[in-house]
Amino acid sequence: MTFSVAVAGASGYAGGELLRILADHPDFDIRTVTAHQNAGQPLAAHQPHLRSLAGLTLSESTAENLAGHDVVFLALPHGKSGEIATQLPADTLVVDCGADHRLEDPDAWAAFYGGEHFGSWAYGVPELPVGAGRQRERLAGAKRIAAPGCNASAVSLALAPGIHAGLIEDADIVSVLAVGPSGAGKALKTMYLASEILGSANPYAVGGTHRHIPEIQQSLRKAGALSPTISFIPVLVPMSRGILATSTARVKPGVSAAQVQAAWEETYAGEPFVQVLPAGSVPRTSDVLGANTALIGVALDAAAGRVVAVLAIDNLYKGTAGAAIQSANIALGLAETAGLSVNGVAP
């Protein structure tokens, strides 16, 4: 069976990555592409690399244009997805790549986003430990899915094994991320100009203001944390796409380096898209470019009494579009790996 697909926000980076992956998916047929400001223009004017889809024309991002498809992917700014989603049929699988349906706590939404809280949907990080199982069990058969924030999934996947195994403390977590500017979207902003980025590293949203903080805390609570606190520092670096998240947490007394390595390996054993590197190895962003793969290196800093977990993902692939499509595969009962690449692009 082939499922008809519509993608809203198709002229942006996340929308373009969705289309790039979906174009070669064996079970999905792209029927409609929409973009509010660019309606009426050819898709090729905004996504010239998608040659197999060059004949498509962008239409308005309205519920009327999106309804009638089996699957709708929303790659819209926060606030916009929630408005449209309420108008779509209940039997349509809707996957929101924006923030509108990630947070369960309306107070956290009000504090970090503001505006109307549209409620939470099944969270699209299948590998996340939840109780005795995984988040994928909550995605099976779902009709509404919230794809994760790219930074949030990077930190959560990096630290969840230690939380779940009871090896690390959930207070005093520190995460420093090197991130590419594509995570901020295509909208023109001075700080993302090449002349501002090249040859520079630029911290932003410092001091506990980044919107992915409550999402990370929510995921770590699902993994077993009681009251997680995190100092989260993203740093904009001159690479178009990619995240290298270095996260540290206090280790509990008596935990050995072997126990740490084993906990991470056991948590992700058999996972097709999350791989733990051998002890002593750390990942690079170049190793996951263009792949739905997360690579993790973990070590015990015995002198500091902390575990250090380093995770690399492609923010547009595994961090956004790949996670959305992986979750949709699960919801529809397809092979979880369908249409998704585990191999990166090099050089």
UniProtKB/Swiss-Prot annotation:
Which sites are catalytic? Answer: 150
> What's in the keyword line of the UniProt record?
Amino-acid biosynthesis, Arginine biosynthesis, Cytoplasm, NADP, Oxidoreductase
Taxonomic superkingdom: Bacteria
Which source organism does the UniProt entry give?
Leifsonia xyli subsp. xyli (strain CTCB07)
Swiss-Prot/TrEMBL catalytic activity: N-acetyl-L-glutamate 5-semialdehyde + phosphate + NADP(+) = N-acetyl-L-glutamyl 5-phosphate + NADPH + H(+)
Where in the cell does this protein reside?
Cytoplasm
Question: Which pathway is this protein engaged in?
Answer: Amino-acid biosynthesis; L-arginine biosynthesis; N(2)-acetyl-L-ornithine from L-glutamate: step 3/4
Q: Which gene is the coding source of this polypeptide chain?
A: argC
- EC nos: 1.2.1.38
The name on file for this protein is: N-acetyl-gamma-glutamyl-phosphate reductase
The similarity comment for this entry is: Belongs to the NAGSA dehydrogenase family. Type 1 subfamily.
InterPro entries, from UniProt?
AGPR_type-1, NAD(P)-bd_dom_sf, NAGSA_dehydrogenase, Semialdehyde_DH_NAD-bd
Give me any GO biological process, just one.
Answer: L-arginine biosynthetic process
Give the GO molecular function terms.
N-acetyl-gamma-glutamyl-phosphate reductase activity; NAD binding; NADP+ binding
Q: List, alphabetically, the GO terms of the cellular component aspect.
A: cytoplasm
Task: Show the Pfam families listed in the entry.
Answer: Semialdhyde_dh, Semialdhyde_dhC_1
Summarize the protein's role: Catalyzes the NADPH-dependent reduction of N-acetyl-5-glutamyl phosphate to yield N-acetyl-L-glutamate 5-semialdehyde.
